[in-house]
Amino acid sequence: MLPGEHDQPPVSIGGMATRLVQINMKAHDDAKLGGFWAEALGWAVSSEGPGVTNLEPEGFVYPDPDPVAVCVDLVVSAEPKTAKNRVHLDLATTSKDHQAELVERLTGLGATPIDIGQGDVPWKVMADPEGNEFCVLDWHDPVADTGPIATVVVDCADPRAMARFWGEATDWTVHRVTDQNAVLRSAQGVGPYLQFLRTPDPKTVWNRVHLDLRPYPGDERDAEAARLRALGATAIDLGDSDIPWTVLADPEGNEFCLLAPG
């Protein structure tokens, strides 16, 4: 699941100029689903415009350099959910009682337990009111200083290749790389982990949940996009040159957005 005491020492890969700043989630009703996730995370709700609901910790001012705050944006979309999401959130707990209380509270908010073939595992697999999968982690996982989101999990075919790409695409530190999973985290050692988990299922549809990256102040988005393409990303042309972000896909086709520097 997450890095433990027997993991390799963190490795920092040079030449990085972006950081993970938010998770973007498509929603049929962004306000309603945003309300669920705001309650689940204990975060504040705002909106940058019609069809977009933004979730941030209380008192957060974007773009905040605090790496604990990997925020969540919900964007309205009429597209139906047709497959298991390849990106999901793991929520942190601190005790057996906390895990049980959180599962009960989330169920009361509209979440449902689901079976995706996980078997007998200590974490709880659930779906939000629109069917997006997420997990409530076992309290034994080392999730100190993550905030309510312990891990952002991305399904993949080759965790080692994902660690190479994302370790250079961002300024996050690689904590673990095996044939089964790779784990990164902010170089400051706080905030959620980013895990690439080996799964047998191929990618078949556009991801309903994706990562948003932001270059640092003083950098140029076009230059960063070129650097990411040189690392193995591919450009995605949406036919709209007016949007203030660049859409790319990682080497396994997972879409992500490169936002304006800030």
Regions found by a protein language model. Give the residues of each.
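Short, small/polar residue-rich loop motifs at catalytic or cofactor-binding pockets
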Residues: 119-121, 241-243
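Glyoxalase I/VOC metalloenzyme domain signal
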Residues: 7-50, 56-115, 127-178, 184-239, ...
